[in-house]
Amino acid sequence: MAPDPIALARDLIRCPSVTPADAGALDRVQSVLEGLGFTCHRLPFQEPGTERVDNLYARLGDKGPNFCFAGHTDVVPAGDAAAWTVDPFGGEIIDGRLYGRGAADMKGGVAAFIAAVGSFLERNGPPAGSISLLITGDEEGPAVNGTRKVLDWMAAAGERIDACLVGEPTNPRALGDMIKVGRRGSLTATLTALGAQGHTAYPHLADNPLPRLAEALHLLASSPLDMGTPHFQPSTLALTSIDVGNPASNVIPARGTARFNIRFNDLHTPESLEAHIRDVLEEVGGAWELALQTSGVAFLTPPGALSDIVAAAVEAHTGRTPELSTSGGTSDARFIKDHCPVVEFGLVGASMHKVDENVAVADLLELTAIYRTVLERWFAGAEPRT
């Protein structure tokens, strides 16, 4: 019998799996998948200086092509539990809505796909190939011991995936609004202007770095990086902090540090953005320290067979024609795109990470039906491969 997506989602929400804790969530997933005939591999990883994270790769079938669903069972903290009107980890249903941390992002999506697989098998029997799931416990955290590591393990084990659907909550307002076919890149910069400390009464004996820092930030923030591309919005630069560490009003500081984040489209690379930043610093002059961290580069899965199948399934069940979008933040699709075509579709994300996170029960059931139709249409056109 196919699993009930509502019951499974409630079970998963009741596991307080705040990154890096698993709290039994993957045990529940594994138990249900093994009941459907999947072979499951638990894959814990731990980079030095990080927390140990558990992951799961499950596969049904030993032939290609291999259709993979990717997702995560870790969640962000509930925050102030007193601000919630329900237990954040209670999985309560009130007025047709399922409440709890992870309901939207993305335990609901995980439950819907597992239930969809069960329904697919009941209606169609074994697939003409394989179905797999890659479920991590490190999507909401540093993302160093999760999907990326599982993909490395899969490559070493000869596990090939031919298409991947990531179940992130992609819809802004209503189920069927949007499919993600790519993501912008993300680069965070820590910029420090260097000077010489001194007394404010004798500024000529000091070197105040703050005017230079202010000028550089103005130049960086006021000049558009681009005007966008056919598939991407314009790149953006957002200033996130300025720190001088100087509580005294009569002291010129020796340094000032700012942090900013750039969300960039496919016109840029981390290297080209670094060159742009350094050009601005050279224009302003003075001494600087610059540290950059890239959490993902821009990528696009060109519209094709996979996005067509998902879009057709969405329209068949919701009556909506989904927008193919690259908006929003990063996701683990940024790791998967190097292995196979990947698109993202899941629940409505309006309440994700918020107090009283919730989804419509009707949406969970409809998402399950959409996922089943995706599997049916994908395997209908699949050529079996040994």
Curated annotation (Swiss-Prot):
Which positions are catalytic residues? 74, 139
What's the Enzyme Commission number for this chain?
3.5.1.18
Q: Which cofactor does it need?
A: Zn(2+); Co(2+)
Q: Which CDD domains match?
A: M20_DapE_proteobac
Which family does the record claim for this protein?
Answer: Belongs to the peptidase M20A family. DapE subfamily.
**Listed GO MF terms:** acetylornithine deacetylase activity; cobalt ion binding; succinyl-diaminopimelate desuccinylase activity; zinc ion binding
Residues binding Zn(2+) 2 are 105, 140, 353
* Residues annotated to bind Zn(2+) 1: 72, 105, 168
Biological process according to GO: diaminopimelate biosynthetic process; L-arginine biosynthetic process; lysine biosynthetic process via diaminopimelate
Kindly provide the name given to this protein in its UniProt entry: Succinyl-diaminopimelate desuccinylase
In terms of superkingdom, the source organism counts as Bacteria
